[in-house]
């Protein structure tokens, strides 16, 4: 198996179809995590999965788990929490803090996090460029002061939102953020949410699998279409009681 070494002065990626067929999805390895390379990766259905000894490993996953916003499913227990909870969901209020919490979150069957400091710096750059966004669920503490309880972040290009990572400091906080974010993104024009991997967690929200070729074609069409309105920073996307 030959793994392509990505040139530092060229952000083009090899065909992910070859990587899926012969390299377990490993598209290539780079010595950088530049914002331009990240954006080109997402446009092609590729994402950085981890780093080792200063090298970044880029993968494609197929079939691809996605959510079509109008087919979002909210589990019954979560719907009850959305109706009765005392939460507030905001957008881009504390992006760096959300990424840091995602990096610190314990993951089943993982010794550490893939969100190393280099990843945090790279996504913060995308945030400054207007491509990376965080959704934050806030809950009141014992004193009544509202505090960050959970959330997630991802990358937006055109009418596609690429989900990256979640965290929860209180039960259901990340789920609340996601359930509020999907219709909000749909209202702005997002037509596809990339979940990257097929997980039970995303299946509960109605994720479905697309063959990678179909997924890549959807990206080709939707990445080129601008949103109706920029995501921006919002203090309240939705809130409970």
Swiss-Prot record:
Sections of the chain in a coiled coil: none
The keyword Acyltransferase appears for this protein: yes
Keywords from the named record: Acyltransferase, Cytoplasm, Transferase
A Pfam family assignment: Leu_Phe_trans
Sequence intervals crossing the membrane: none
UniProt EC number: 2.3.2.6
InterPro entries: Acyl_CoA_acyltransferase, Leu/Phe-tRNA_Trfase, Leu/Phe-tRNA_Trfase_C, Leu/Phe-tRNA_Trfase_N
Disulfide linkage: none
Compartments, as annotated in UniProt: Cytoplasm
NCBIfam families: aat (TIGR00667)
Name the UniProt record assigns to this protein: Leucyl/phenylalanyl-tRNA--protein transferase
Organism per entry: Neisseria meningitidis serogroup C (strain 053442)
Gene name linked to the record: aat
């Amino acid at each position: 198996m030959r793994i392509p070494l990505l040139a530092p002065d060229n952000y083009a990626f090899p065909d992910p179809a070859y990587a899926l067929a012969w390299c377990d999805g490993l598209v290539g390895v780079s010595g950088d995590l530049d914002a331009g390379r990240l954006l080109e990766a997402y446009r092609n259905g590729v994402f950085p999965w981890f780093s080792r000894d200063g090298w970044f490993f880029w993968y494609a996953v197929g079939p691809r788990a996605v959510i079509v916003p109008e087919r979002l499913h909210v589990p019954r227990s979560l719907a009850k929490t959305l109706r009765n909870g005392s939460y507030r969901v905001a957008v881009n209020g504390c992006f760096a803090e959300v990424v840091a919490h995602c990096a610190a979150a314990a993951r089943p069957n993982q010794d550490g996090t893939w969100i190393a400091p280099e990843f945090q710096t790279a996504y913060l750059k995308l945030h400054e460029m207007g491509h990376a966004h965080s959704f934050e669920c806030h809950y009141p503490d014992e004193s009544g002061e509202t505090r960050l309880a959970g959330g997630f972040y991802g990358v937006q290009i055109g009418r596609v939102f690429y989900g990256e990572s979640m965290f929860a400091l209180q039960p259901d906080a990340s789920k609340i953020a996601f359930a509020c974010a999907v219709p909000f993104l749909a209202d702005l024009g997002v037509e596809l949410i990339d979940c990257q991997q097929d997980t039970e967690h995303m299946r509960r929200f109605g994720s479905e699998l697309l063959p990678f070729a179909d997924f890549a074609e959807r990206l080709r069409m939707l990445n080129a279409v601008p949103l109706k309105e920029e995501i921006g920073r919002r203090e309240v996307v939705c809130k409970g009681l």
